[in-house]
Amino acid sequence: FQGAAAAAAAPVDADIQQAYLFGCVRVLVRLGAGKPDVGALREAVHVYRRQLLPISSRAEVPVDWSTVQRELGKALGHIGYEEDSAAELKEAVIAFEKALQVVRREAMPQRWASIQNELGDAYRMLADIGGGCEREAQAAYDAALEVHTKADSPTDWALVRLSIGLLLGSWSERCRDLGMAEAALAALKDATAVLPEQKLATTRSLEGYIREVEATRDALRG
């Protein structure tokens, strides 16, 4: 993928250049997140910041600009998760919030809700490493559920419910809250009832996590 970083220097049409770079760097993020390969993810962040943002003006192409900000947020989120890095996770939050400056619920409700869910994930990961952003994560997830309803988009709804379950499960252990542990298990049950196996396999060892939350609940029950 070294050619992706060099492509901006080629004398080609700006739209072709942008499409080429964007396609390459999205593959780079997918590969980096899958292995995981933090080096690949950092290269992707560099391309987003140094190559794509300069040719994706918010004033001229606001939707393209917001898309780059969103994808930048995803790459930073993967790095933050792999390295327990509050710095990258905070930068991911900033990138998602910038994307939401352009992507409005009224005009692009599904995209808006998806970015809210991604913002919630960044806040949740910050909370897990001591960032104290649990309420911000919950607010973002609640916003996503305003659009991603079970009736209209069950898979998206279940993915948000899964994220809420992960948030509340860890939060309940930190603050020793029985009601929160029970709410976490309810959310995880909602998710597992709807999501296909391949979706669940990409999140974490969910069965083990559910057992951990059940143990927390049982301990709090006394």
Task: Name the predicted role of every residue range.
Residues 1-2, 41, 48-52, 89, ...:
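Hydrophobic/aromatic packing residues within the alpha-helices of TPR/SEL1-like helical repeat arrays
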Residues 28-43, 77-91, 124-136, 170-183, ...:
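Short coil/turn connectors between adjacent alpha-helices in alpha-solenoid helical repeat scaffolds
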Residues 1-35, 42-55, 186-189, 203-222:
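Defense-system signaling and execution modules centered on TIR/cGAS-STING-like, death/scaffold domains
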Residues 40-41, 68, 88-89, 115-116, ...:
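Amphipathic coiled-coil alpha-helices
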Residues 16-33, 63-81, 110-125, 156-166, ...:
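Conserved alpha-helical positions within TPR/SEL1-like repeat arrays
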Residues 94-101, 105-155, 159, 164:
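Eukaryotic tandem repeat interaction scaffolds
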Residues 139-142, 178-199:
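TPR/TPR-like (Sel1-like) alpha-helical repeat modules
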Residues 1-17, 34-35, 50-65, 100-112, ...:
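Flexible helix-coil transition and linker loops at the boundaries of alpha-helical arrays
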